[in-house]
Amino acid sequence: YPLETIDSNVIGLRKLLDLSLEFNPEGILFFSTSEIYGNPDSDNIPTKETYFGNVNSFGPRASYDESKRLSETLCYIYNDKFELPINIVRPFNNYGPGLNINDGRVIPDFFKNILENKDIEIYSDGTSTRTFCYISDAITGYLLALLSKDKGEVYNIGNDVPEISMSNLANLIIDISNSKSKVVYKTNEDIHYLTNNPQR
């Protein structure tokens, strides 16, 4: 739903910000995404909030990444022009209870394979790495960002370490599940696969 994604992230947010001007809120927290960074080069990993990004505007996930980038610009304008007290958070790979098994992220995908008695399929050589942030830790970060007296700021919410490879993550999930599943490595013909998904 690329057009609906753009409408929700941009037009929906604009309407919400306009409405907020009538109520003089003490604070607004906008949830952006780490995907606005695109594919940082090795000099920008871990990725700082000041990194402008390296995003592909032409691909299947571009509507999400680019609409979030434009949404951040809207937040900046409303803070700068109208002094609306907005802060922005960019979540990195949160996980924990309540994660939808069908949401397409790596941890639920791996568990879904196991629950269906299937092997875990990794569409790479398994060496790519990620860091993960437990949801209660992320919520602490979100709350601190919301309550901060400094407004018009951007905060990455995630962990710098430890990194884990997709291969090791798959084997860890197999081990803690006492599963007989195996890890199977495949290639993906989609050139956009694993893009715009910063490590940390």
Residue ranges and their predicted role:
Residues 1-94, 136:
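N-terminal Rossmann-like NAD(P)+-binding domain of SDR-like oxidoreductases, especially those catalyzing
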Residues 33, 43, 106, 110, ...:
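Activation loop
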Residues 48, 93, 112-200:
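C-terminal substrate-binding subdomain of Rossmann-fold SDR/epimerase-dehydratase oxidoreductases
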Residues 17, 76, 108-112, 143:
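Solvent-exposed, non-membrane alpha-helical residues enriched in polar/charged side chains
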Residues 63, 71, 103, 166, ...:
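Conserved donor sugar-nucleotide recognition element shared by glycan-biosynthetic enzymes
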Residues 70, 74, 78, 110, ...:
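Hydrophobic alpha-helix immediately C-terminal to the catalytic Tyr-X-X-X-Lys motif of short-chain
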Residues 1, 98-102, 195-197:
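Short, solvent-exposed loop/turn segments at secondary-structure boundaries
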Residues 43, 59, 99-103, 162:
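Residue-level signature of the cytosolic catalytic core of signaling kinases
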